[in-house]
Amino acid sequence: MSNVGDKFELSRDEFRNITQCLGNEEFRKLFAEYCQELKDPENRKQYEEELKLMEAERGYDVKFIKPLPGYVIKTVVDGKTKAFVNVCHCDLVGKPSSQCSTNKRGEKGLKWSIPYAQSQPRKDYDNKNVDCVVYDVVFHYDTLHLTKSNKNFRKLVTDTALDAVEGAFHVSLDRVNLKFPKLQYKGVAKMTVIRQKLKNFETRRKDGLIDTLYRASEQSKITHDNSADKENVNKQTFKSASQLEYTTPAYKLIHRKEVEYHELTGELDAKLDAAIPKELVLVIELPLLKSANQCTLNVTSSEVHLISDSPAKYKLEVKLPYTVLEKNGSAKFNTDETTLTVLLPVARNRRTLNDVTVSSNDQSMPDEMDQKPVERVKPLKEPQLVHSNANKKIIFPKFSANKMDNIFAFTLNVRNVDPSSIELQKGTDTVSCRFTNIGNGFFPCYYIFFLRFPNANITEVQHEEWDNNIILQVVLDHGLIDCYYAGTNENDLVQYSIMEDITDKINKFGKEIEDDSLCIAVSKNAIKQERKSSHLSIEIKTKDEIESDEGIDSALEGELKTDQSMQEDENPDEINTRTVEDDTKVAKENVKKVDQETAHEGKKSKKNQRRKNKKRSLSESCCDHLKVTINNDNPKPESGNEANSFEGTGSSSEATSKQRKARSVSESCPARDNNGVESDSVDNLSALIQFNHKYKGILKRSSLQRSISECSSIDEHYYLGTSVDGSSVAESVDHTNGELSESCRKTVRFNDAIKTKLFRSNTSILGQKKKNAKKNESKRRALTRRLSEGESTDNEDKDHQTTNEAPGSVVQRDTEHDSGISLDSDAAHPIEINADTEVQNQHQNDSTKPIEINRKVEKKFIASKNNNCNVKAQFIKSKRNDSSDIEFKSDMIFDIEM
């Protein structure tokens, strides 16, 4: 081994190869045979003879030294590692010799010459499996024989062996704490080779190959000291070391300190004691001690003393760099590493700025200054120009400009400007501003802002300093300039335009470039121009949306014109006749529906249970922007004729019970005044047409999709010129309602009056259904009785109305059913009749105001709700020519204030 401290490292490939080879039986056999050959003495002799012949050819005499056991010396290498020195003997080593001599004092004695040989150190382990180092020093047998009879000679041999190890391998051995264990040899003996040059050797032709192979052997790690060449290295030093009674152990002193947050701040007293440690840590290495009881430790405020007599002699004195608190210290011995750790806190005296005193020399400084002669500075007779330093880098600041009449305001965006460094120089048409600021690296930056105004004279210049900028105000004699020049000096100017035309951008083809993706359209409906309270609306739309809106408006106007022409050509008498026939069919079908309700009572209860279990996907206000709300509480007539029409129907309004009704599109059709101008409901109507009747009433769950002719004749729908029957309309509405069934379903918005009358704040709507189940059953039975008993009453009322009407008017009669809904829609959905009629029937016995809207057609529509599908509707001829009716449909949404 070249180095004792080197660890034997085995790579993965080598470990894998060795494992595979040892797993092979043939390899194990061959390896066992090889080991047997090495142990065979005959083979060893043959190997030694061949090696001697080879070395003799090169002029060297080779001897194989086999160390025989003698005695062992135990010590410490460099104060850290245990070491064992084997003092061995061999007959091939030279015998000791002595001569009589006299020392410097004149005393006579013997001068001994002791030959020895030593091998390379090797690594081994002690009885505790701790690393140690083993050295072999081989003497002649006569040398060891003399040590047994003479103690002084034994000490001489021991010192010689230690000197040989220290001189050859440059280590330091502890000679004070030497031990001699009861061992004759440490470890396994290894053969050593001694090479000596032959004296009468004839020089032969050098073989380059042999010289190359044995070049390393010339620097053999095995050394042999002849008696003539034997000299002890640093002999005086070793003698002085042997005279010491104690060994100074190796130690290290550590300064330990914890960093506090307040020391990282920029305060003046933050780093007053930053260099003083918090505690001192003294680590002492004691490899020959087993516990702390074998040594004595004394600690003072400035020193540490350690002494040990048994089993090893150690003595240590350490002066501490800081004053410590000896009473607060602690010590700990580590048996594994055989180290003693002493922890001593440092006594710190916290100083403040007030503790700083002024020395006597500083106090005498003012007196000394007064005694010095004062040098007077003579003023210059002629002013001299001071040129700026050419090494200074001039920076042009970033700025922004504003103009108002003949006043210019320049904002120079520079921070931390020194106000004392601002210099302004005003010329006829030029302004120069110089200033400095402190940059991020705490170094000054120099700025120059130079201005020139062509065809203008500067009358006044002012400046204001702020934390983030400088405002430079320049006043000119006139404001008729279109540009100015700015830069660092007069030779480096850039032209800046005062006003740039941003909107007029012409491309290379000569066309104007505009971003028409978003425009502001100011529109005022032409239909509403004659209204008294016209409103101006501003909408922000894209270009595509404007084109689509124009197409919808043109289509809507065409439909309105077509319906108006159809109304003029249609005969009112024929329309009323068709309506009476339809109402007769409706009355017959209603009688059948009463019987069907009893048969499907079980199915209704199951359907109601399914409704309770339904969940809504969005909040109740997610589609408020899609609803149309019409308030008809107190209609204000715009002309006198309209007022008279409302007065004529006042009696019938009071007789009708106050009930809520979910009206259809036909019920809320726009009303026209005498001039033919539509009311505000035209906008709501166009919104409903665009959504294709997607939404139902807010108070009912009716799935009936009624056609145009269910509530009134075709001539009343002058705005809907179509011949589509109710079935096709129902299919289209079902398709559109299915698209929004999950997102916009059951969205309800009530006013304060309905909230206070119909709902309780501490319960939910589904909870109220369960509580009102019995009420719904009783109301359904009462409804059946009224249908059977109300035929004669309805006939008497209709006869009374016929006698009171003016001659020549057409009256629509309904003898069996008071609803204008076609029987087809009811028959198609017999099960969909809503059983939740508590909202409509809650005010059954109260009087309700009729909803009346005047139009050109001389008819009056009076509607009152008994339930969602049974609506009493009567068309009466009004006394006034300007009266009109309104059509109701189930998918309209209203807020009716009571």
UniProtKB/Swiss-Prot annotation:
Polar residues: bias regions: 641-656
Main location (coarse class): cytoplasm
Subcellular locations according to the entry: Cytoplasm
Record has Thylakoid as a keyword: no
HAMAP family: Kintoun
Function: Required for cytoplasmic pre-assembly of axonemal dyneins, thereby playing a central role in motility in cilia and flagella. Involved in pre-assembly of dynein arm complexes in the cytoplasm before intraflagellar transport loads them for the ciliary compartment.
Protein name per UniProt: Protein kintoun
